[in-house]
A protein has these predicted regions:
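An aromatic-rich alpha-helical recognition segment common to small helix-rich domains
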Residues: 27, 44, 55, 79, ...
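Pro/Thr/Ser/Gly-rich low-complexity, intrinsically disordered linker/stalk tracts
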Residues: 22-49, 84, 101-117
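Structural signature of eukaryotic scaffold interfaces centered on beta-propeller domains
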Residues: 1-10
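Beta-strand-rich modules
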Residues: 79-99
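Extracellular low-complexity, O-glycosylation-prone stalks/linkers
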Residues: 47-69, 74
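Hydrophobic core positions of the immunoglobulin-like beta-sandwich fold
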Residues: 32, 77-80
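Structural motif
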Residues: 15-21
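Residue-level signal for short segments within beta-strands and strand-turn junctions
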Residues: 21-23, 57-59, 94-98
Length: 117
């Protein structure tokens, strides 16, 4: 199922405006495909309606985008320049592009992965 659901709103006043949007599903199958001393390869399932994906890493007390995949067919990414024997946290979400606007789905559960010694 590509979408969780549809929603709409009508704003009435001096003029009436309508708004319609779809809520994307979260990304499924998010996991570590492989680990090395200085890198982690992450993978996920292709979203049926996704235009791309946003991958974030938790660094310095905040979430930082490390990858924005602009192709819906991209289902893996290797995060490099990591420290050996260290745990890292990641999360991902899909987005759908409508014209110049990106509509984001919900974030995945946080994935914690440790690099090798």
């Amino acid at each position: 199922m590509p979408f969780i659901g549809d929603s709409s709103a009508i704003i009435a006043g001096a003029e009436t405006y309508g708004l319609y949007y779809r809520i994307l599903n979260g990304v499924g199958g998010f996991k570590a495909k492989s680990t090395a001393k200085n890198s982690i390869t992450l993978g996920w399932n292709k979203g049926a309606t996704a235009s791309g994906y946003q991958l974030q890493q938790y660094k310095g007390g905040k979430w930082v985008t490390v990858y924005t995949g602009t192709k819906a067919t991209s289902t893996s990414y290797t995060v490099k320049r990591l420290k050996a024997n260290t745990s890292y946290k990641f999360r991902i979400r899909a987005y759908k592009t409508y014209g110049n606007t990106k509509q984001y789905g919900s974030w995945s559960k946080v994935l914690t992965v440790k690099t090798k010694r």
